[in-house]
A protein has these predicted regions:
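A short beta-strand-turn-helix
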Residues: 65-84
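Non-catalytic, surface beta->alpha helical segment in thiol-disulfide oxidoreductase systems
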Residues: 171-238
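Sec-dependent N-terminal signal peptides of Gram-positive bacterial secreted proteins and lipoproteins
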Residues: 2-27
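Typically the conserved alpha-helix immediately C-terminal to a functionally engaged Cys/Sec
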Residues: 98-111
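Thiol-based oxidoreductase modules, predominantly thioredoxin-like and allied folds used
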Residues: 70, 89, 113-163
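N-proximal helix/coil linker or "cap" segments that precede and/or mark the start of modular domains
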Residues: 28-65
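Short active-site neighborhood of thiol/selenol oxidoreductases, capturing the structured segment around
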Residues: 80-94, 104
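The canonical Cys-X-X-Cys-His
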Residues: 94-98, 182
Length: 238
């Protein structure tokens, strides 16, 4: 017994000396790193001009300690089929996403949710363009993308993704994940989802900040989604 105690003391000292104040978990480090990466990706567009339409990006301010954890298409599919959690599908350049994120994080903080899984759609989905009157795939989808579409099929609607050029419509013959999309999964089943943000007023564009009324409306949407998943949560714990 004395020998075991000595071994335990040695291991503790090793962790203290070579690992900082203790042996911290890899998962916590990864999530913290993900949160910082997410903050940097979104905030670096503040005050810049979007090339596609010449509009000024809406400004966001994100805390370093946020609940984001990056996942790819295959990991998202596994969560949808087998686990419980919230997945956010978005991209840093998406103006609707930039308006949605502060609201989503506020709800997560109130609900004491530590993790929101994040699928960066730029790193997952394909891109089509019309070139010389033909539909061309200019960016290939990443591994697991079509399996993800299948897993989300029930909430993606019936219509396939189409592009229009010179009055002609081109059908990709596949569904599309539109952003921002927040999906709530409970024990391997999708129980709730919300796509987009809220309706804009006549004097607003997609780059305009949300009004208080719009913020409150979106907040209630996300709050309901979280409650449908974590319905055993109280003010103190989940």
């Amino acid at each position: 017994m004395e020998k075991i105690k000595k071994i335990g003391i040695v291991l503790f000292l090793f962790c203290f000396i070579f690992g900082g104040i203790g042996c911290s978990s890899t998962t916590k480090k990864e999530e913290s790193s993900d949160g910082i990466q997410f903050k940097e990706e979104y905030e670096k567009l503040n005050g810049t001009i979007r090339e596609s339409d010449g509009a000024l990006y809406n400004t966001v301010s994100i805390e370093k300690e946020n609940p984001i954890k990056y996942i790819d298409a295959k990991e998202a599919t596994q969560i949808i089929k087998n686990k419980t959690g919230v997945i956010y599908f978005g991209a840093s350049w998406c103006p609707w996403c930039r308006n949605a994120i502060p609201v989503l994080f506020d709800v997560a903080k109130k609900k004491k949710i530590d993790t929101i899984y994040y699928v960066d759609m730029d790193q997952v989905r394909n891109i089509y363009e019309i070139k010389d009157g033909s539909l061309v795939k200019v960016q290939e989808e990443k591994e697991g993308y079509y399996e993800l579409l299948e897993a989300l099929d029930s909430i993606l609607g019936e219509n396939t993704y189409t592009l229009t050029s010179d009055g002609q419509t081109y059908d990709t013959k596949e569904k599309r994940i539109y952003m921002p999309l927040v999906v709530g999964i409970k024990e391997g089943s999708i129980v709730d989802s919300h796509v987009g943000t809220v309706s804009l007023n006549e004097d607003q564009t997609k780059y305009s900040p949300l009004t208080k009324e719009q913020y409150d409306e979106l907040y209630k949407q996300y709050e309901s989604l979280f409650s449908n998943i974590y319905n055993s949560c109280t003010d103190n714990k989940c």
